[in-house]
Amino acid sequence: MHQGVITFSRNVFLPLTTVCQNHCGYCSFWTPIQKGCIMGREQVIETLRLGAGAGCTEALFTFGERPEMVPGFSEHLAAIGYSSILDYCYDLCKEALRFGILPHTNAGVLSTGEMERLREVNASMGLMLETTADVPAHQGSIGKSPAERLSMIARAGKLRIPFTTGILLGIGETTRDREESLEAIADLQREYGHIQEVIVQNFCPKEGTPMADVTPITTETFCETVRMARAILPEEVAVQVAPNLADAGVLVGCGANDLGGISPVTIDYVNPEHPWPAIDRLTEVAGDAVLRERLCIYPQYITQGWYPPSMEPLIRSLSIKIQERSL
């Protein structure tokens, strides 16, 4: 990423289900199985249509990890004609491409075979590391094993999948834990070269969760961690912060250079109490830096051809579109 440039992606957020095998102490995204626990195809299509009309270039597909492991969920899947949430996601990624929007899927820990299949219809993928530490917030969350998550990130590297990961601050980890987490990500990047951005995200307490009364990190600690990330991560890896969760203008001054996906159409379903800033206000966050729109696949991976050949016309077309919007 060029110095003095702050980037963002224009996206739509599509939470296909909030059912999850994990029960993290800080999460309000999780819900029990109930009617409507799967986002219907019609709603997805309508959201994609609105996103395309608003100039969105990224469809963020996310959902609870391994929801089929939760008793009763498979019946809801069967009712819409599927036996696997990943099969459903695959088909909806194809719909996104049909609307001219590039899919980016974050589905939790996946096997090599599952990633190989999803990469056919995704321009990039992601998985938050969160932390390498064993923290109480992850008790009862089988999918939050740091070793399992690091292993998946490595497998994505072997498959040459442009990848997003990140750390979560304020869930019981120490400063040294943050450093170790960033060092682990940096090591994977040096080995495989596939990590395009690392999210440094602050935990925001949610009412009704076990960690509702936990004090969030201070702006000073957040800024120190962003500086740490910039110092530890290879230069080509963007440091991303969410402008709806913190004072991103301050964090840009500490070394952050990406604002992540911002949607003119959908809310942040993980943090619904924190609305996105309007895209035309992002220049205020960027300050003296140049604000530049990007795709969910970063330019260096486009140059290297790290995408399915079938996506090339769309990637080229969208690259031109965002360049024209920046003029």
Swiss-Prot record:
EC id: 4.3.1.32
Catalytic activity: 5-amino-5-(4-hydroxybenzyl)-6-(D-ribitylimino)-5,6-dihydrouracil + S-adenosyl-L-methionine = 7,8-didemethyl-8-hydroxy-5-deazariboflavin + 5'-deoxyadenosine + L-methionine + NH4(+) + H(+)
Keyword hit for GTP-binding: no
Note accompanying the cofactor annotation: Binds 1 [4Fe-4S] cluster. The cluster is coordinated with 3 cysteines and an exchangeable S-adenosyl-L-methionine.
All copies of domain Radical SAM core, residue ranges: 6-244
Functional note: Catalyzes the radical-mediated synthesis of 7,8-didemethyl-8-hydroxy-5-deazariboflavin from 5-amino-5-(4-hydroxybenzyl)-6-(D-ribitylimino)-5,6-dihydrouracil.
Superkingdom field: Archaea
Protein name according to UniProt: 7,8-didemethyl-8-hydroxy-5-deazariboflavin synthase
GO terms for MF: 4 iron, 4 sulfur cluster binding; 7,8-didemethyl-8-hydroxy-5-deazariboflavin synthase activity; iron ion binding; transferase activity, transferring alkyl or aryl (other than methyl) groups
Pfam families: Radical_SAM
Keyword S-adenosyl-L-methionine among record annotations: yes
Pathway field: Cofactor biosynthesis; coenzyme F0 biosynthesis
Cofactor: [4Fe-4S] cluster
Family statement: Belongs to the radical SAM superfamily. CofG family.
PROSITE patterns listed in its UniProt record: RADICAL_SAM (PS51918)
NCBIfam families, per the entry: F420_cofG (TIGR03550), PRK06245.1 (NF004884)
The entry's keywords: 4Fe-4S, Iron, Iron-sulfur, Lyase, Metal-binding, S-adenosyl-L-methionine
Binding residues for [4Fe-4S] cluster: 20, 24, 27
Class of enzymatic activity (EC top level): lyase
Complex formation: Consists of two subunits, CofG and CofH.
